[in-house]
Amino acid sequence: MSGTLEKVLCLRNNTIFKQAFSLLRFRTSGEKPIYSVGGILLSISRPYKTKPTHGIGKYKHLIKAEEPKKKKGKVEVRAINLGTDYEYGVLNIHLTAYDMTLAESYAQYVHNLCNSLSIKVEESYAMPTKTIEVLQLQDQGSKMLLDSVLTTHERVVQISGLSATFAEIFLEIIQSSLPEGVRLSVKEHTEEDFKGRFKARPELEELLAKLK
């Protein structure tokens, strides 16, 4: 029994001696040992001693670089499709109302209807808002007083490639579902319609004319 105990003590002393020797070797080399389960010594080099979490959580290399935004140039007039004998060219569906919500919602309905009927929609846009002042003449005198102000909102749905045989059916559909207070008109697209989309700036035009 005593012999077995002596062997265990010898093995334990050898293990302690080896650990002490390893610790001394790490200290002389300047490395810091890290103890793990079982008493085994591990050595891990730390390249960032002052920043232990340096580089963790980087994600920018996973995101594609954003392209530089292009400057908006002057809008130019596109070539107008005049159509053929069997189908119309570019048509403008004008929807005018005093209620902006009503005009906008019905323009969306017409746009979705064209998509469901496979009618190509070139674009949908809003025209500049127009304001009309209603003046009232006094009973006595010639002075005019402001009675009310009417604001007109207009939306345009531009379509192309509408066949002549289906045009009558399409117009009947949108006219039958026309809400009260909305005025509908359909006409061919012209260059004047394109220019009418933008507000006139006479002061800027005068300055540009002087510079030229």
From Swiss-Prot:
SUPFAM superfamilies: Ribosomal protein S10. It is found in: Mitochondrion. It holds the Pfam family Ribosomal_S10. GO terms for cellular component: mitochondrial inner membrane; mitochondrial large ribosomal subunit; mitochondrial ribosome; mitochondrion. Signal peptide: none annotated. InterPro entries: Ribosomal_mL48, Ribosomal_uS10_dom, Ribosomal_uS10_dom_sf. SMART domains: Ribosomal_S10. The keyword Ribosomal protein applies. The modification N6-succinyllysine is found at K199. It comes from the Eukaryota. Residues 1-28 form a transit peptide. Keywords: Mitochondrion, Ribonucleoprotein, Ribosomal protein, Transit peptide. GO terms for biological process: mitochondrial translation. Transmembrane segments: none annotated. Belongs to the mitochondrion-specific ribosomal protein mL48 family. PANTHER family: LARGE RIBOSOMAL SUBUNIT PROTEIN ML48, MITOCHONDRIAL RIBOSOMAL PROTEIN L48. Component of the mitochondrial large ribosomal subunit (mt-LSU). Mature mammalian 55S mitochondrial ribosomes consist of a small (28S) and a large (39S) subunit. The 28S small subunit contains a 12S ribosomal RNA (12S mt-rRNA) and 30 different proteins. The 39S large subunit contains a 16S rRNA (16S mt-rRNA), a copy of mitochondrial valine transfer RNA (mt-tRNA(Val)), which plays an integral structural role, and 52 different proteins. mL48 is located at the central protuberance. Interacts with OXA1L. This is Large ribosomal subunit protein mL48.
